[in-house]
């Protein structure tokens, strides 16, 4: 049976972008929640865990470097955006497979941090390609709801890779799945995350068909154009931030919610372990907050489409 090309219809596009963004949240939840909690239980200090969690998000700050490259370097045979999404998802899976046998201990922390940093580099690049695809295939009337669903998917992906894995590690008492009653080791939890990513790869990405992009430049010209766009972006951004005091205050205001969220990333998990929360308790907290966040994302998207 042939799987549908989801981006060919409005409903399909909304479903596709929801699940594509979910593949960004799943590994983030696994690394920032599951791995951070297990590191704390293994006796790794808060400072080291904080550095590890901070490294997860570092590649996301440099997505603007990949934007021109994703725009200009592509294969019409694979699909201009589909090729990037497919390639980055495969590399995300490979980095998790490499990381799987490594024990979460202070001796291995530098190696694990490096591997997860590389993993998130591919995850952030995938985000650039997904956004580029959205710009190409979404109509103006679809963008508000689609954007809300995208961030809802990412938000729900976090507890799927974090809270759900913590439930599996602690153990789930299901009469029809007695093997999960005593819990699973952390190394086995990697397979759950990998399976979630590959499920989206198989059902959403592989059947996807893009309209071929017209090539206007040679490979060398495209790379030169990418370099020019990056330099132009840096120059324009710098002038925008330092040229007016309003822009500087705007930048500070934009950092406030991100800073508060960043403070909670590692601190919340390590403190929860210290005060006696079980893996299930931490998972419950993450599920509740993520569901509320996801609902607000969708509502915001609907309001955006209605009000403009």
Give each language-model segment a name.
Residues 46-50, 79, 140-150, 279-280:
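Loop-to-transmembrane helix entry/capping segments in MFS-fold secondary transporters
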Residues 68-74, 100-104, 160-184, 305:
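Transmembrane alpha-helix termini and helix-breaking/packing motifs in multi-pass membrane transporters
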Residues 61-79, 296-308:
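Helix-to-loop junctions at the C-terminal end of transmembrane segments
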Residues 1-10, 210-249:
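Juxtamembrane intracellular "pre-TM" segments in multi-pass secondary transporters
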Residues 59-63, 144-170:
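Glycine-rich segments within core transmembrane alpha-helices of 12-TM secondary carriers
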Residues 194-217:
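C-terminal membrane-cytosol helix-exit motif in multi-pass small-molecule transporters
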Residues 2-60, 246-253, 257-278, 282:
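Helix-loop boundary and gating motifs at the non-cytosolic
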Residues 85-107:
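C-terminal ends and interior cores of transmembrane alpha-helices
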